[in-house]
Every structure is written in structure tokens, then in C-alpha cells.
């Protein structure tokens, strides 16, 4: 029997509902909803009713019904104004037309070049640390993720080509994100966003023209997008190349930086597991050797730690869809116009799926335990046809950072109160201050 809509979570305020709590501490909101009502409950964001779902079965429906009864784009209009019509902000037709270009960017053969870029930039960062000192890993990972993206997508001359102000313009765009306010209001942050977009467009348009004039000199993201036919047989116009570049940077660099910082923090907080990681690195990573695909494939404990970090501290802890046609979820009929959200705060902590779910235990992903077999149990990289195209890129980047950092340095975690900072985009991490000492005989390049 189909019942009425799911029950409402407590704590809503007149007019605004749960909006403030959603923006400031959605983890507490979602966990309270689950405690009160189980795996299906309703919150109100202003006048907008939102169904929040928990568990792999409901997550599977969420992802498989996307582009059918669930619309992906309407929930991200604030992002569309910031980065343009690309990836999850694009219309269904545009997304499927662009998809061959996105697949080309992240195909397996290109991962070899990306891994090379990651090795170079990670080692440059490690060399810059000197023999000993202290570093805020959270900020360092933001800077490093920018450098990796620049070298991987633009090439070795990325610093000169992008210019010193590129990332400042990007930060102005990221700071403008606001899922509440209409994105075209004449506010200072939206004006700064629009000015930054113009400057970035000018920079990238010049790079595109250089590659049009001398295609033989380049083999990077832009040349890939200039030469890869779309589904309809056409080639991307320049404005769409700029948009895709911005979309990839936006979707990847902040989320990867946050996950990488949490990964290092969690390993330092759990020295017994860190010892397993260090032993694995010592066995499989030769001093002064670049990590290639063969080497990375042997770092099981590192990748299990990455998966456990995604479970416990996801940068993307929720995603949203709009109900276009009435849909039955469990015993409820969800009307058109509602929104639906997945919740890492609850799905990732189900005791029937993950043993001792609050504990950092990467070994849960080992084959003999197999807690990560259901692809819809964890939502950190999305799911279904829209699953993050750059997932392997991000995981490899985190693995290379982890392997080289702990290979070359003895470390001590100084920060004691490391917290998730929830924002209007990806979740961030508070300061992760680490004291380090270069190991005797550790390679130092340059």
C-alpha cells in the first residue's frame, strides 16, 4: 500500500524550515532524521520539501532513476551560474552529447601521463618542505591539488600559461556559491564571480588559440577537447572547452584536496594502521622511483584507507535530484516538484553494512571482509552513469601523495581538534598541522 509522504524531521522553523541547520550542520540534521524516522524522512528547505534517503537500495534507485523520473540539473542552478553548463549542471541532452569528450579525458591510457604529472608535483612539494618543520596539510593539499591539475591538464608550462592570478579568480568563483540566494542578484560576491569568469575565460581562450595555431606542440586537456568528436559528431566550441575545464577543476580539486588532507590526518591518528601502510610502501615503492600503475596496484592498504576516508569524511557527502514525475520510494509516493537527497552521514554509518561503523578501519575493504562490495553503499563519488569521471584520477593522486609523503618523512600530528567545515560547495577540513623530519637517505630532487 502506498502511504502519504515521509514524516517530517523535528526542529524545523517557521518559513525557513531546516534551511539554517542544513547549511551549518547537515550531518546532525540527517542523523536526527534517521534516528526519528529511519531510512526515509522529509526536511524543509524554505518552502521546498526534500526527501532524504539512506541505504544502498534507496541510493541505487536515486542513481538509476536519474535522467528518468529524477532530474539532476535543477538542484544545481547555483553551480551553473558559477561554472556554466557542464557535467552535473548541464541539461541531459548536453551532458550525453559531451560525454565522449569527458570519457576521452579520463581514459586509462591518459592515466599514465597524469600519474607522471602527479609524481612531479608531489615531489616538488616534498622538496619544498626542507629537512624539518611544520606544515598545515589542509592548505598544502589545496595548493598541491591546484599544481597537479595545472600540470596534468595544461602541461609543464602551466604556471606561465595560467598566470599568477588564475587560482585567485577561481577562488572568487568558489566563494560566490550560494544555494539559497538567486545567483543573479546584484551582490558584491556575484559581481566578483562574474569578473573572475571573464578573466578566466580570457586566459583559457588564449591557451585554446595557441593550441589551434600549433597543435603539434601540445598534448593536453585542451588539445584533447579540440579533437574529440562529441556524440553528435561535432567538436566542442571554444566557450564549451572553457566551461569543461572549469567544471573539471571545480568538481575535482577541492574535493580531492579535502579527502587527501583527511587521509593523512586519519592515518596519523591511527598509528597501527599507518604502520601497515608504511610497511607496504617500503615493500613496493623504491626510493627516488616514480609511482606507476604497476606500483600503485600493489598499494592495497593505501587504497583501502582512501575508501575508508571517503566513507568517514566524504568531501561530497550529499547529492540532490528533483522529482520530475511522481515516484514510489519504499512505501511512499513522492510528488513531482519534491527534491531527493542521498546522505553519507547516514548511509555510511549503517551497522548492518559496516561493522563498528564509527571506527576508522580500512581493513573492512579487504577481500576477506568485503564490506565495500555494494557499489551503492558509499556515495562519495556519486553513482550510476553520472558517477564521478575523475574518481580514479583522484584516488591515484591521493595514493601518490600518501606513498611519497610517508616514505620520505617521519611525522607527528600536532592538531588535536580536526573538524569538518561544511560549506556551500565541497566539505573542507580544519587545520591539520603536522611536524615533519626528513628521513635519513630520503630522496630530495632538485
Where are these regions (language model features)?
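N-terminal membrane-proximal hinge/A-helix region immediately C-terminal to the signal-anchor transmembrane segment
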Residues: 1-93, 97, 116-124, 377
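Conserved cytochrome P450 K-helix E-x-x-R motif and the immediately C-terminal K′/meander segment
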Residues: 16-38, 206, 289-330, 445
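Cytochrome P450 I-helix active-site segment
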Residues: 5-15, 115, 119, 216-223, ...
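Cytochrome P450 proximal C-terminal region
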Residues: 34, 122, 166-169, 173, ...
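Cytochrome P450 heme-thiolate monooxygenase catalytic core
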Residues: 1-7, 15, 30, 71-78, ...
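Cytochrome P450 catalytic-core helices
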Residues: 255-274, 278-280, 392-407
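Conserved cytochrome P450 K-helix/beta-meander segment immediately N-terminal to the heme-binding cysteine loop
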Residues: 342-369
